[in-house]
Each structure stands twice: as C-alpha cells, then as structure tokens.
C-alpha cells in the first residue's frame, strides 16, 4: 500500500533485480500510470511482474499456501535472525501507517524488523524492501 510513487518505482526496480513479483494493495497513494512511478522504476518497469489487489484480505487469500515474513517496527524478531527460503513472500506496509494491526496480530510469529535507534520512527519503505530482499538473496546463496 505505498503512498509515494517514487518508492513504488524503486521497489519495482528492486523486484526486477532479484526476480520477485510485486503486489500492490489498494488504496494506493497514486495512480499506477503515474509518471513519478515510471521515472523511479526507469526502463525496468516494463520488466516488473506485478499485480494489484483491493485489500489485505484479498492479498492473503491470493497468497494462501505461501510462507510469509511481514516487516514491522513492532516485531520482536530481527531480520538477521530469520531464515529465508526461495518462494517466501515479504510483506511491507505503507509509509504513513505500516501494516494494519489486525494483520500484525494474525501473523505475529511471522513478523520481522530491522534494527534502528529509538530516535528513528521508521525507515524509508524502498530502502527497507531493498535491504530485506538482498538479505534473502544472501541467504539463498545468490540469484537463480
């Protein structure tokens, strides 16, 4: 549920780089044909496999059977302590609000966070996606 098209564009570029599918959960803070989205994704956007769903319920239904890690600053477990395997789904919230509390509660055992000093409320969404995506690639031993 990104609010900022530039973040979504950068996330799309990261997805292309690591071979991941990008899911958007509506409502979005921009239109999917937004010029800022395309500019941030550069010419990689045409190579990005993506899909949009109407809400979190629809996303969890579509991803039933997939193992997930959810990223939230409210998690107890650090990203570095998680085991990633190919086929896992990484779920991130929106810049302004993060993941819905109901989703965090439902999947509490699957929630992870990046460490940060208490003076920082949150990290940039695109930076967080990039960091976690490449930690998973590192654990896989590289790209396929």
Q: Model-derived features: where do they sit?
A:
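Post-transcriptional modification and biogenesis factors for structured RNAs
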Residues: 1-144
């Amino acid at each position: 549920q990104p609010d900022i098209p530039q973040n979504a564009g950068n996330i799309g570029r990261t997805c292309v780089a690591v071979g991941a599918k990008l899911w958007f959960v509506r409502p979005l803070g921009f239109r999917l044909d937004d010029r800022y989205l395309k500019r941030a994704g550069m010419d990689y956007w045409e190579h990005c496999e993506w899909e949009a769903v109407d809400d979190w319920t629809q996303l969890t239904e579509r991803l039933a059977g997939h193992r997930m890690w959810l990223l939230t600053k409210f998690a107890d477990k650090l990203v570095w302590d998680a085991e990633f395997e190919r086929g896992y789904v990484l779920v991130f919230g929106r810049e302004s609000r993060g993941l819905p509390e109901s989703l965090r509660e439902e999947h509490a055992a699957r929630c992870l966070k990046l460490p940060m000093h208490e003076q920082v409320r949150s990290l940039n969404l695109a930076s967080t996606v990039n960091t976690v995506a490449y930690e998973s690639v590192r654990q896989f031993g590289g790209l396929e």
